[in-house]
């Protein structure tokens, strides 16, 4: 654990990975100063509420559903895309809620998920070596836009403001209405080739809604049935953006990163002695850490010591991302070592990043079956070790893209090019995401019955 006094800027004294170099240092400082003058995107009290919800997840009184785009885009920003994402998250949540008889904590990868880590600093584009694309908040995807520009942080902030405004409206309006969301699911079951597999759950939800209405419960007049809590999250990768959005809460005198309710550290930046861990140890938001197949028990426990030294329940989420072929070998030993130490940890699964492959044409994709297999293994391993599979973390979209192969739509390698729009990694489309939710619902129900 670092013995240095923490401040929003103390990370500058630590080694940093996956960070851009800006040529114009004066412009960088000007942009950061302007960002610091802007209102917070979220409030400290909301982040505390989320921590309380995540504490309930650890106590097996709720389940975490975290999902959204691989990377948000300036050019593809639209109200319809936000609506479609929110809609499919609500559809997934109602299925999981009913199957598990448990509240679902809904956290979007949205309103700030602009930066992406890259394996290499440069790449070849049109036979020319250029800087790698690191997300719209840093540089552009075209060859002429590869130089990092500080002013992109301002555009990311303003787009996040607009996104949050729309999400808050959806969460308090008709799009979160329980009856309306269930109608969306009925359409999915009706129009899906494998609909019969999910018909039983859909029928039982219909019966439950009918029973409530027969008892005089009017959904339109019952806030708990037409409004939802929806929280935001992103990877805290670009610390030049995160630092100026830190605020000291007037009620608790504690620091919060007000760019999102929840933040996470990626597999490439989780060095306990690195800048990203140093920055996040000092803010009181709930924190996630991606845990890959090579993580050791000692590394994970050191991260727990640095990021959650007081073992606060709901503070720390370990997001396992090992791949369907590796998780059965690596996760049991890791769980055994960490569970001995009695840490309050929310364990969730990211079944996307460990299952990325390239087709014969060099196109990045993920197989739905591999994603599903890793989720299944995650639940099975937790059961065997006497622990809880407490959440799922997905890269997904509400659109009808063709980026991941398989699922009930039987997307093939040959059909990927039909609607392949991602600027970074392949995402589950709306149908695949909802299909996965129905399948996870069965696992959650079984876990709850134990």
Predicted features, each with a name:
Residues 71-72, 76-323, 366, 391-393, ...:
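Active-site-facing alpha/beta catalytic cores
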Residues 300-303, 307-309, 315-346, 353-402:
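Non-transmembrane, aqueous-exposed alpha-helical and coiled segments at domain scale
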Residues 1-63:
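N-terminal basic/disordered segments at the start of proteins
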Residues 65-70, 107-110, 349-352, 395-397:
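Short loop/turn segments at strand-loop or loop-helix junctions that form parts
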Residues 54-57, 95-97, 279-280, 381-384:
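A general structural signal for short secondary-structure junctions and capping/turn motifs
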Residues 60-63, 345-349:
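Short coil-to-beta-strand
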Residues 49-51, 273-276, 332-334:
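Glycine-rich, charged/polar anion/phosphate-binding loops
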């Amino acid at each position: 654990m670092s013995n240095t006094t923490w401040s929003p800027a103390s990370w500058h004294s630590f080694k940093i990975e996956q960070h851009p170099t800006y040529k114009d240092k004066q412009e960088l400082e000007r942009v950061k100063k302007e960002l610091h003058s802007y209102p917070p995107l979220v409030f400290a009290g909301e982040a505390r509420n989320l921590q309380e919800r995540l504490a309930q997840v650890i106590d097996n009184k709720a389940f975490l559903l975290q999902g959204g785009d691989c990377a948000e885009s300036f050019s593809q920003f639209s109200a319809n895309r936000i609506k479609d994402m929110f809609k499919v998250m609500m559809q997934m949540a109602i299925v999981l809620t009913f199957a598990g008889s448990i509240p679902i904590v809904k956290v979007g990868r949205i309103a700030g998920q602009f930066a992406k880590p890259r394996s290499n600093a440069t790449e070849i584009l049109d036979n020319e070596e250029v800087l790698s694309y690191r997300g719209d908040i840093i540089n552009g995807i075209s060859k002429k836009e590869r130089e990092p520009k500080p002013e992109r942080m301002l555009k990311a902030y303003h787009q996040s403001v607009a996104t949050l405004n729309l999400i808050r409206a959806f969460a308090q309006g008709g799009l979160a209405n329980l009856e309306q969301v269930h109608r969306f699911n009925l359409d999915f079951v009706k129009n899906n080739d494998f609909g019969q597999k999910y018909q039983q759950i859909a029928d039982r939800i219909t019966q439950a809604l009918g029973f409530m209405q027969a008892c005089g419960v009017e959904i339109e007049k019952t806030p708990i049935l037409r409004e939802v809590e929806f929280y935001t999250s992103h990877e805290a990768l670009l610390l030049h953006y995160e630092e100026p959005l830190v605020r000291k809460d007037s009620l608790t005198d504690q620091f919060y990163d007000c760019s999102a309710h929840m933040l996470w550290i990626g597999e490439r930046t989780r060095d306990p002695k690195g800048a990203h861990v140093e920055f996040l140890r000092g803010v009181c938001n709930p924190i996630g850490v991606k845990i890959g197949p090579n993580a050791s028990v000692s590394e994970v426990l050191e991260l727990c010591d640095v990021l959650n030294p007081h073992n606060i329940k709901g503070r720390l989420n370990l997001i396992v991302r090992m791949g369907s072929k590796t998780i059965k070998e690596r996760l049991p030993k890791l769980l055994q070592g960490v569970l001995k130490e009695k840490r309050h940890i929310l364990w969730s699964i990211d079944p996307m990043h460990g299952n990325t492959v390239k087709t014969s044409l060099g196109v990045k994709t993920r197989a739905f079956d591999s994603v599903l297999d890793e989720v299944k293994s995650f639940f099975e391993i937790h059961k065997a070790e006497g622990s809880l599979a407490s959440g799922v973390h997905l890269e997904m979209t509400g659109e009808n893209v063709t980026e991941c192969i398989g699922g009930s739509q039987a997307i093939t390698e040959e059909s990927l090019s039909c609607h392949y729009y991602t600027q970074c990694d392949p995402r589950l489309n709306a149908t695949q995401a909802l299909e996965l939710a129905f399948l996870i619902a069965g696992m959650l129900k079984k876990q709850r019955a134990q």
